[in-house]
UniProtKB/Swiss-Prot annotation:
Involved in coproporphyrin-dependent heme b biosynthesis. Catalyzes the decarboxylation of Fe-coproporphyrin III (coproheme) to heme b (protoheme IX), the last step of the pathway. The reaction occurs in a stepwise manner with a three-propionate harderoheme intermediate. Fe-coproporphyrin III binds at residues 136, 150-154, 177, 190, 228. The gene is chdC. GO terms for biological process: heme B biosynthetic process. This is Coproheme decarboxylase. The keyword Cell inner membrane does not apply.
Length: 254
């Protein structure tokens, strides 16, 4: 392999479940015009959808979670993981056809696939048969109290072009970057989804924790790592609180 080919060698990825982050804003003014019985009927229909989608998680064929979003960017986020893009689209359509969707306004969405790169991969055999790898590619989304989502790119400008680095340089940088993430094991669960060709950024990062301050600490610490400081470009950050079937009615109460 030539030196130029080595320089431009692309990282290979292991790909798992497809992911949809669907952010909605409630039309509270229209929602308030409904009678209490009408609202309860709509909430009942929506919880029925959530329970239906939850069957896939029990069967190990996907996962989903719901969070209320803090701030003006959105009111809630539905995150869905499924084996195929078709199943992801089907759930999106099911929600869009529901009565609750009539009282929501799309705020933002992100389409991607759970991804592991070969920067840090090692070992022999089929990685898709490795239980540790499978748990990361096909995760059950936790019911952590808090979530943080943001999209990101690797910079491609001037002397700070990630894609002009050799595989060895990128691997070394990602190794030190990964050490920071692993230092938060037990405090933050991180799911990386790849979105090159799927959405406007290259990756989506979803963080879960029972201590919301861990998001701030983790992201801030990573800012000093060269991968983020020199090559990272970030989109909007969304932070929210977990919504369960028990707390959903209170969220929608007016």
């Amino acid at each position: 392999m030539s030196e130029q080919q080595m320089t431009n060698e692309a990282a290979k990825t292991l790909d798992g479940w497809y992911a949809l982050h669907d952010f909605r804003t409630m039309d509270w003014a229209s929602w308030k015009l409904l009678s209490s019985d009408e609202r309860q009927s709509i909430i009942h229909e929506f919880t029925g959808l959530l329970e239906k989608w939850g069957v896939a998680q029990k069967e190990g064929k996907g996962s989903q979670t719901l969070y209320s979003i803090v701030g003006q960017k959105a009111d809630f986020m539905l995150m869905i993981l499924r084996p195929t893009m078709e199943e992801l689209n089907q759930i999106e359509l099911e929600f869009n056809k529901s009565r609750l969707a009539e009282f929501t306004i799309p705020a933002y969405s992100y389409v991607s696939v759970v991804e592991l790169s070969n920067y840090l991969a090692s070992g022999d055999g089929d990685p898709y048969e490795n239980p540790h790898v499978r748990a990361r590619l096909y995760p059950e989304l936790p019911e952590s109290k808090y979530v943080c989502f943001y999209p990101m790119d690797k910079r491609r400008s001037g002397n700070d072009n990630w894609y002009m680095l050799s595989m060895e340089e990128r691997r070394n940088l990602m190794r030190s970057h990964g050490l920071i993430g692993r230092s938060y094991a037990g405090k933050v669960k991180q799911i990386i989804t790849g979105s090159v060709g799927f959405d406007d950024y290259e990756w989506g990062v979803t963080l879960f924790s029972d201590d919301v301050l861990q998001f701030k600490k983790l992201v801030y610490e990573m800012r000093f790592d060269e991968v983020s400081a020199r090559y990272g470009e970030f989109g909007s950050f969304f932070v929210g609180n977990h919504l369960s079937l028990d707390t959903l009615p209170q969220f929608l109460y007016v």
